[in-house]
Amino acid sequence: MLNKCFIKNYNYNIQLVRYIESKHSNTFQIIKDYMDTLVYSVKSKFDDYDIALLTMLFETKRMSQNTKVKRVYLYNSYSFIHQNYITALLKEAFKGVIEIVEKDTLNLTYEGLQKKNVDIIISNVKLEIKDIPVVQISDMPTDKELSKIKKLL
């Protein structure tokens, strides 16, 4: 009689293979074809679960390389404390996706923004800056405003 743990793991493995094969079909097929040719050399059989794990490994690397950190300039008309709070709020909301360009190291000119490779400006006041997206937020950013920022990222 098969134990329940074995059956549970077996079912999980089948679901995992199906998901990975569907989500990353090109990579899965390339690895499967390569492993089929490798079978002759190593005299070992690789099942779909092994191929799914290798696919996950390659896709994880590919996805992590495609993530580009966006440089954000935060312009705020309030105090230093308010600026720090909004900075922390944005960093928490967009972990690993944004880098805040420090305000004291930059003049708010197009040339200054360009020098620092600013991708997006977030401000609680209306700004007219050419060629760099500006998202105007309220003094305390709402979920709708955070969603708008997320779309730009």
From Swiss-Prot:
Signal peptide: none annotated. Keywords: Plasmid, Transcription, Transcription regulation. Gene3D superfamilies: 3.40.50.2300. It comes from the Bacteria. PANTHER family: CRYPTIC BETA-GLUCOSIDE BGL OPERON ANTITERMINATOR, TRANSCRIPTIONAL REGULATOR MTLR. Belongs to the AtxA/AcpA family. This is Putative trans-acting regulator pXO2-62/BXB0076/GBAA_pXO2_0076.
